[in-house]
């Protein structure tokens, strides 16, 4: 469905960071997918610090959403997403969901909402972030009438994505390897009852 201006509801929108000034134009196609990313990702399974999940609560020093927002706001950066999930699980909207993000996934910007999970320098994520991924994706699926299906297991870049509600950047771009966002993020949705397709 095409949408007018959409903002995340409470409790997700704990803080709305300013919209990134370079955000794209209004959508001319319906939202068909959520594309999940991690800020670091990793290029392949040989990465020296593969992703891991930290069970403890994130300390303030781990919360980097405002740093990511500032980086994406620079005029020399083309990347961006609609939503950030910080280390403590806080969800930040940084672009109107009714617009296409300027650039988060080649070929899918017009038909998807980009969600970036903030990763630590050692590639780790916090368990609270996975809880927020599930809650946010569930809300997005309800709001945009998306199927509760997730691209799992990872099989490389997919030629066909019809009927898949949530994809990883890794499923759509050959230069992302298996780690953007990585199995932990995708498995959280399957564990919450989403269909693996």
State the predicted function of each range.
Residues 1-109, 177:
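N-terminal catalytic cores of peptidoglycan-degrading enzymes
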Residues 1-15, 24-29, 121-197:
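Basic/polar, cationic surfaces and motifs that engage anionic cell-wall
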Residues 33, 112, 165-167:
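Structural preference for beta-strand elements that scaffold enzyme active sites
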Residues 100, 114-125:
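Substrate-binding clefts and substrate-entry loops adjacent to catalytic sites
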